[in-house]
């Protein structure tokens, strides 16, 4: 039954969304197995979960799984362009599920949606748990509480005009407005949140930064660093969705072209592999000597951006850092060069500086594709204004690989909820899931691919010092 408090684009899209969910179920064997094992037990009964994660069909199936396990949900997307409106419509019809997401939100609307997903009552009551992607929901709670303390002690309100970009100004404006309405909302909310589980590399960096400064207000489980997330979603997911996004956006031939991949972490590895497989000449930029030598050993040229910027046909950032492709680089690119980002946030490329630069002409070609005429007359193609091109220009990672990631999210939520009173997890620390669960997630997906495990005999188990049922590797093993 549709929750009238939801805010979505078009409820009439729900039947199509439900059909897509039904089709994708067969491609998400892990989530379906979790449902079979846990649905009758309702282990999440009573849990209020806020989600801030791309509102796709795969996410809809994650939400439905959490709901079937007993949870109540309030959900928003973590990117203004990544929502599939038919997915939002379909999942909003589930009992005890509210959705605040639509494709093409403004930044002001985006943060409104995040606040709505976090707010469970008229007096500002919050969730028990958070499913996060990029840590935006958790960040809002932390910064809100921080500014409330400043207001309580010194009567200083956040000044939106001090924001370094439009998004930060919207963010500060929301917190200012919130404090004037309820000066203890985020502080009170943070005290009741049991914990959060974080999906991405970028979000983990954000959480670690808060933790390092002794500012973590509730437990965090780092889902990204589970092997069955990091090595599958980040590598194989990007290997599938990057070329999908590039081809849908441009229809340009990739074979024979020069593709520059900025960053050779797990995401970069998947991107470079995909481009190589399509016949591109791949160049990699890196700061880490370990990642750089890995790229060279795979046959890629490792260069600086300055060396290749005037020659590249496609540029893709995937570093999790800021200001990777600067304005000075953009202005030097050749005619019809394509620029996009597959890292979580939009500040890897200085798009705002480009769009406001004197002499620039911007022409929208189609949704999330802009052609920018540079002062020298060259035209470059900018994808998704520097946001996630695989989700903005296509539909993101395939369902099968997301089944791995979302199994880890479900297990993280179960761990937090079931151990809320045991003391297993400290409130101001971050954790990763135990290896037993990592192996369990992998095991769930073997049957779908007709793979059969070899079983160790007793002598082999004794020699290795492991159980027949695992875990089979030490915590230090890097796969």
Curated annotation (Swiss-Prot):
Record text on cofactor binding: Binds 1 NAD(+) per subunit.
Pfam families, per database record: AdoHcyase (PF05221), AdoHcyase_NAD (PF00670)
Transmembrane segments: none
Binding site for NAD(+): 200-202, 234, 263-268, 286, 321, 342-344, 390
EC number annotated for this UniProt entry: 3.13.2.1
Hydrolase among keywords: yes
A cellular component annotation (GO) from this entry: cytosol
InterPro entries: Adenosylhomocyst_ase-like_sf (IPR042172), Adenosylhomocysteinase-like (IPR000043), Ado_hCys_hydrolase_NAD-bd (IPR015878), NAD(P)-bd_dom_sf (IPR036291), S-Ado-L-homoCys_hydrolase_CS (IPR020082)
A GO term for molecular function: adenosylhomocysteinase activity
Pathway: Amino-acid biosynthesis; L-homocysteine biosynthesis; L-homocysteine from S-adenosyl-L-homocysteine: step 1/1
Keyword Transmembrane applies: no
Binding site residues for substrate: 56, 133, 199, 229, 233
Cofactor: NAD(+)
GO biological process: one-carbon metabolic process; S-adenosylmethionine cycle
Top-rank taxon: Eukaryota
Annotated keywords: Hydrolase, NAD, One-carbon metabolism
Reaction(s) this enzyme catalyzes, per UniProt: S-adenosyl-L-homocysteine + H2O = L-homocysteine + adenosine
UniProt-listed NCBIfam families: ahcY (TIGR00936), PRK05476.2-3 (NF004005)
Family: Belongs to the adenosylhomocysteinase family.
Function description: Adenosylhomocysteine is a competitive inhibitor of S-adenosyl-L-methionine-dependent methyl transferase reactions; therefore adenosylhomocysteinase may play a key role in the control of methylations via regulation of the intracellular concentration of adenosylhomocysteine.
Quaternary structure and interacting proteins, as annotated: Homotetramer.
Protein name: Adenosylhomocysteinase
């Amino acid at each position: 039954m549709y929750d009238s408090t939801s805010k979505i684009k078009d409820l009439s899209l729900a039947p199509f969304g439900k059909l897509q969910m039904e089709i994708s179920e067969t491609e998400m064997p892990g989530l379906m197995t979790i449902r079979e094992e846990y649905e009758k037990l309702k282990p999440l009964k009573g849990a209020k979960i806020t989600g801030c994660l791309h509102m796709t069909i795969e996410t809809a199936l994650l939400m439905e799984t959490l709901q079937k396990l007993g949870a109540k949900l309030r959900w928003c997307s973590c990117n203004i362009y990544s929502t599939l409106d038919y997915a939002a419509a379909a999942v909003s019809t589930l009992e005890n599920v509210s959705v605040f997401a639509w494709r093409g939100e403004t930044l002001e609307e985006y943060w409104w949606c995040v606040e709505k997903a976090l707010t469970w009552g008229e007096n500002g009551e919050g969730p028990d748990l958070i499913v996060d992607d990029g840590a935006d929901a958790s960040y809002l709670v932390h910064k809100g509480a921080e500014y409330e303390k400043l207001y309580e002690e010194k009567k200083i309100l956040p000044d939106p005009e001090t924001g370094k970009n439009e998004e930060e100004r919207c963010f500060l404006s929301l917190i200012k407005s919130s404090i004037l309405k309820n000066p203890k909302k985020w502080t009170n909310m943070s005290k009741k949140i049991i914990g959060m589980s974080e999906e991405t590399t970028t979000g983990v960096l954000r959480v670690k930064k808060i933790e390092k400064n002794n500012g973590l207000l509730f437990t965090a489980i780092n889902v990204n660093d589970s092997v069955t997330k990091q090595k599958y979603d980040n590598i194989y997911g990007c290997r599938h969705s990057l070329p999908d996004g590039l081809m849908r956006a441009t229809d340009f031939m990739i074979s024979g072209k020069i593709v520059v991949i900025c960053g050779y972490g797990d995401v970069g590895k998947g991107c470079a592999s995909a481009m190589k497989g399509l016949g591109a000449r791949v160049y990699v930029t890196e700061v880490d000597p370990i990642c750089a030598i890995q790229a060279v050993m795979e046959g890629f040229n490792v260069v600086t951006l300055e060396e290749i910027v005037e020659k590249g046909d496609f540029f893709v950032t995937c570093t999790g850092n800021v200001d990777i492709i600067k304005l000075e680089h953009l202005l030097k690119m050749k005619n019809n060069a394509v620029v996009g980002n597959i890292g979580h946030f939009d500040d890897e490329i200085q798009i705002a500086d480009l769009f406001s630069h004197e002499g620039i002409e911007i022409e929208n070609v189609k949704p999330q594709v802009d052609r920018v005429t540079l002062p020298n007359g060259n035209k470059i193609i900018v994808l998704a204004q520097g946001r996630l091109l695989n989700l903005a220009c296509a539909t993101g990672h395939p369902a099968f690989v997301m089944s791995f990631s979302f199994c880890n999210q479900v297990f993280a939520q179960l761990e937090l909820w079931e151990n809320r009173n045991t003391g297993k997890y400290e409130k101001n620390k971050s954790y990763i899931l135990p290896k037993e669960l990592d192996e369990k997630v992998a095991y769930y997906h073997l049957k779908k691919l007709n793979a059969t495990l070899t079983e160790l005999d007793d002598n082999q188990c004794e020699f290795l010092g492991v159980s027949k049922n695992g875990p089979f590797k030490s915590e230090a093993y890097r796969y």
